Amino acid sequence: MQMEFSFSSPSFFFLLPFLFLLIKPLISRKSSLKLPPGPKKFPIVGNLFQMEGLLPHLALKKMTDKYGPICHLKLGELEAVVVSSAELAKEVLNTHAVTFADRPVTNVSKIVMYNNSGMTFARYGDYFKLLRQIYASELLSPKRVRSSSNHMEDELSKFVVKIQAETGKPIFLHDRVKSYLFAVLFDSMIGGVCKCPERYIEAAKELSANSAAMRLEDFFPSVTLLPKLSGFNTVLAKLKKEIDDLLDDLISEREKRPANATGPMEEHMLDVLLKLRNGSGSEAKIPITNEDIKAVVFELMLANLSTAATEEWAMSEMMRNPKVFKKAQDEVRRAFKGKNRICASELHKLEYLKLVIKEALRMHPPAPLLFPRKAREDCEIGGYTIPAGTMVWVNYWAVGRDPQLWHDADKFEPERFSDTSIDFNGSHSELIPFGAGRRICPGILYSATNLELLLSALLYHFDWELPSGEKPEEIDMDEFYGSGCIRKNPLALVPKVVIPCQA
């Protein structure tokens, strides 16, 4: 999530005196607590101005470099704490998992994500626990990922054939990768091809780009006039209507299928959710509404964008490090020698490629600031008091670049994971790009499988060059931050077919 600040509006300065009157009663209690250290807080705005000019994970890293691995901030009306060490991240995400299991509410989560529905934004409680169970046992279970492998392979072959048709020309991989990921998701979701998939992709991209998830309005929640003055809620309402129409069509089409069209083994993701809505699922102790279903479906689409971003970062780093690229490519070509397509059943042979993915996730996590938590009660972290209601960020980008944890932390070196058990499953606090604890991302296996398939196909079937004689060290690695961290400028590469594929 990104913080976006704009103080140029005259309305903001007009409201300053009223904001001060609202905030003043909160100051006395905080002064008696042992809060973490942090920068000086200015009246009303707190530390908001100090966040301008840098991407949020970099701005917060700069603060924790000065004040220590736990840092207290005042962001408008909100109390916030940032932790930037593996040890403190473990305290927040694991040791005190229940205390920090809630999410803060934002305009984006309220308006676009169906009043904080879906697993990502839901408040911690019975509804969240039900969704977590549904994800684990049905939607993204190991069984479903395995059953999707044949279709993944088929879509991967189509993906490769399309790239083959453009051999010798610079191409942007990211759009083709998204098309593959959405085709796989729709097959898992409805058992077939979706009408106009590009409309869903564009809607997800637009929401991601607009998910500067905490804006000025979010930092002053008591000032209900701010959203109207900024006009951002109008933008969100228009986007919500577009998303709503798309998802209503998807659900309606699925409901029209004949009752005997699918057997138990052919039940797809949307079928599972519709069954729960109708009260016939074994977990249906809490009513599931159409809005809940739409929130879950759309958050799965948004997750595809994170997988696509990780694939692009991994290719970028391998192109910048030719020795790593060759080592990974040699391994893939040995594993699939003599075959004309990539098979999911052989992915277990790719030990080095798995290290490449770990290293890409260490250096370029999908969400450099893990989705924020909200303290449900007062709690002590690192010897400091975190008051109830405080928003807590784990700056995983800082953990992934911590020189006390990683030798040559800014160097892309997959070998650092050789002969270690460190994995991104949430049990090793030094590598938590998907989070940890009760709110860990439920789609780790699904995402990792798609990443391995995509990178294997790109390395196996093609050699790759940079366009116009660009040198590896000249590759632009600038970031853009929306709902996650992506390349600011898409990676352009020139494919050369080596091992043709037939779809």
Swiss-Prot record:
Query: Could you say which residues form the signal peptide?
Result: none
Q: Which InterPro entries match?
A: Cyt_P450 (IPR001128), Cyt_P450_CS (IPR017972), Cyt_P450_E_grp-I (IPR002401), Cyt_P450_sf (IPR036396)
Q: Quote the EC number.
A: 1.14.19.80
One GO cellular component term:
membrane
**Keyword tRNA-binding included in the entry's annotation:** no
List UniProt keywords, sorted A-Z: Heme, Iron, Membrane, Metal-binding, Monooxygenase, Oxidoreductase, Transmembrane, Transmembrane helix
What is this protein's function? Monooxygenase involved in the biosynthesis of curare monoterpene indole alkaloids (MIAs), natural products such as diaboline, a pharmacologically active compound used to regulate blood pressure. Curare alkaloids act as animal glycine receptor antagonists. Catalyzes the conversion of geissoschizine to dehydropreakuammicine by cyclization, which is spontaneously converted into akuammicine by aromatization.
Q: What is this protein called?
A: Geissoschizine oxidase
**Species for this entry:** Strychnos sp
